[in-house]
Amino acid sequence: VCDIFRKTKNPLQIIEQLSYLTSEPILPQKTLLILDEIQDCPEAISAMKYFCEKTPEYVVACAGSLLGLAFGHQGFSFPVGKVDHIKMYPVTFSEFLEQRDERLYQYYMSIDSLEPLPDVFFDRLSQAFTAYRISGGMPAAAMKMIEKDLSGVETTLRNILQDYSLDFVKHATPLLANRISHVWKSLPSQLAKENRKFVYQLVRPGARAREYEDALTWLKNAGLIYKVSLCSTPQVPLKSYEDLSIFKIYSLDVGLLRVLADLSPEAYLVDNPIFKEYKGALAENYILQSLVANGVNCSHYWASGNKAEVEFIVQRGLEVVPVEVKSGIS
């Protein structure tokens, strides 16, 4: 398919050839043309400019890896202002539940008060939530969990992590790729601390901020981590009070974090006092990714020395909303 885009930039010629290739008519305003893995064909990315300008009556949807789109190709112009962006996130718990048990999902969505749930629903929702925390929201892993294929969940998540490691090498210089890998692999250790604050010494003994700032920025821009900065004063606007030198980082997905930390699924299924120490980190990661997936900017936290801390603070209009996360009963 990419050869078609390499040989011409004329949208009508491209559509005609794609129609021949697929043996399907591509009709204006009636056919949705989907170009998957578009990051592998930079010529197709550039062609979107001409689709927008010359044939806006054709509807085209492109899907691609943020890594490939952000870092993959030099010398090709991105059609700025010619495409609408939709950022995709890991599957949320509600989306997972809808596919796992539609009737339970309908009950879950009908909950509109903070009243205790009937035991029968509480138990079923707890089981579903445990399953979600094990698999996380990466679509292939979540589907394996819905199919009750626990081994498939583990294989899928490990394959994704392996693919990320290969992407580090593919899309960065050798020195930067090495530093990216060090930061990424330090994530479980960073979150194992009580205050979760990022410490460069956990990346590598003797590490300094100026050596690893680019690696952190790379991971953030690639969508693999979230960076949550300290806000000294919880007042609007939060950005005016943030301390960029003090921050926490979280994984894009709680399932990936679990596997990156080498925690087996059984950790969720047994009452292990050792695991309780890490439960808080996983709970915070879950809340963060859920808020982000629902359009909430969650890039600040508040702390008052060693006395008190609120895991996340969110600016909503002229108000600051505190989000405190508890992983157990309190």
Please describe what each predicted stretch is.
Residues 2-29:
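Short glycine-rich substrate-engagement loop in P-loop NTPases that contacts/grips substrate
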Residues 3-7, 38-48, 72-73:
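Conserved ATPase-coupling elements of RecA-like P-loop NTPase cores
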Residues 26-44:
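Conserved P-loop NTPase "ATPase switch" module shared by AAA+ and STAND
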Residues 34, 59-65, 87, 96:
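Structural recognition of the conserved hydrophobic beta-strand(s) that form the central parallel beta-sheet
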Residues 45-68:
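Conserved catalytic/switch belt of AAA+ P-loop NTPases
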Residues 73-192:
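Interdomain motor-coupling "hinge/lid" segment immediately C-terminal to the ATP-binding subdomain
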Residues 142-319:
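Accessory nucleic acid-recognition modules appended to NTPase machines
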Residues 318-329:
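Active-site ExK catalytic segment of metal-dependent nucleases
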